[in-house]
Amino acid sequence: MYYSAGTYEAFAHPEKPEGVDNKSAYIIGTGLAGLTAAFYLVRDGQMKGERIHLLEKLELAGGSCDGYRDITKGFYMRGGREMDNHFEVMWDTFRDVPSIETPGVSVLDEYYWLNKHDPNYSLCRASVNRGEDAHTDKQFKLDKESAMALSKLFLTPEKDLEDKKISDVLPDSFWDTNFWLYWQTMFAFQRWSSALEMKRYLCRYVHHIDGLPDFSALRFTKYNQYESMILPLVKYLESHGVRIEYGMDVKNVIIETEGNKKVAKQIVYVKDGQEQTIDLIEDDLVFITNGCCTDTSCYGDQTHAPDLSKVKNGAGESWDMWKAIAAQAKHGEFGNPDNFCSDVDATNWMSATVATSNEEIIRHIMNVCKRDPRSGKVTTGGIVTVKDSTENWYLSWTINRQPQFKSQDKNTVLVWLYGLHTDREGNFVKKAMRDCTGEEICREWLYHIGVEESRIGELAATACNTTTCYMPYINAFFQPRKESDRPKVVPDGAVNFAFIGQFAETPRDTIFTTEYSMRTGMESVYTLLNVDRGVPEVWGSKYDVRELLRACYYAVDKKPIDELPLSFGEREAVKLLLKKVKGTDVELL
């Protein structure tokens, strides 16, 4: 497997890999990583669909990319997905997946046209004083010490950041900047999150620095992620004969190591309460989704808080499977799951979905976001962060294009919100978020969008239906780590197995993205089948001097060099540099 850039490799069709007709594939998990692996087995690996088996524990494909309607409880959306124009593997995939809504076009075409006609941007990034615009005004407000520390982090080798927290490398003044407000709430980082991962994010999205304050860097799907991404991919695979076998609870993959050679020999699973096995030969390829950020999700509804009785450090079936596999490693080459799943207090947050058609509430929504949520177009343009709640639940909320579900009534608006601090009291509701019913969480949100206090109780109870989800491991992949804590996509010496998903290690890309999962799926197939075509490299904006200079300009809020808070020595050095480059192409840059 090798990386490439440019259209020569991107537009080429690889030859059929040698021996593929004798091979079969077993893919554990039907999240984006597993579905993408199946896609590349079909399209580029040219494996017959009948020889590809997706093993899924649940009754629905999609993994963490879900979105569904419970007939009795309402709509559930655990999370949302923000996309980038340089998700190279994602767009390489969806350019060949047919739309299930618009005949004759691809999912990429449909998505491209939508975001061209209705580009995303926010008119209110944060609120204060119960619904007033906080006027962050696209400013980062970085002080000199914070700006220098970010620059140093950008340039620090990953090896030097292993097992370090963000708080280990950035000054206290950084937490009060708009940069951190944008960053933390957009990506769900915490102060104790991995400094290594923050460096990757800085490098990966340096070309989007100017679009972070108002989300103009982002693109969104028309409907929820399940209907817009998962369903078309599933239908594509099914049309090629790929089988999804539901109710398959995989417990272990038995791997034998002889010298430097590692071979998957057996899959152990439970179906209908009975433990069973699948024996494997070297021509049987196994793709393992190790770990899951939504494992042990706990659901609540309008009148019930989520039941957290089963939540404890390390508990979860995806972790149990990974631990069973990791225990077979001779030198830790299958990763260290305990690094990610052993501190629920650090890795949890909670989301909620509010459904309403109440005109009074919608007027308050429009007062904040300056748009009509029932227009069918961009509404909030990304999350609105409630600055007043930073020491409480730390709420952010968003309304994507409506309807979010094809079955959604045209008068109903779905609001998604989340809180980073589930153990703290709310500003209005004096309970920990995780202990609250949907109705109580709705009250807190109504309070922050400016609804009169005397009206909040009645509206939350009768004009809204709120479902909730507490996710103990949703930030697990942000835990400080070293390179060996996640197994390589294809470990050294592995003959017929690979690790895929958010807890597999691939260089340069960032977790908590659709692209990361899909990239591991593509890389795993290309490696095990030796597909002779380049995997598109992670977009290299960090190597583009134009993007770096542009990012510096926006990071200091577009101040000219002579207005920056520089010391006398620094100013003199800048003057000398500008004199040296005068009349050159560097000056033009």
Model-derived segments and their meaning:
Residues 1-25, 43-51, 551-589:
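Extreme N-terminal leader/targeting segments of oxidoreductases
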Residues 29-35:
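Glycine-rich Rossmann-fold phosphate-binding loop(s) that bind the pyrophosphate
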Residues 42-69:
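Glycine-rich FAD pyrophosphate-binding loop
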Residues 100-207, 219-220:
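Rossmann-like flavin
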Residues 203-285, 289-291, 303-304, 309-311, ...:
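Helical element adjacent to the flavin cofactor pocket in flavoenzyme catalytic cores
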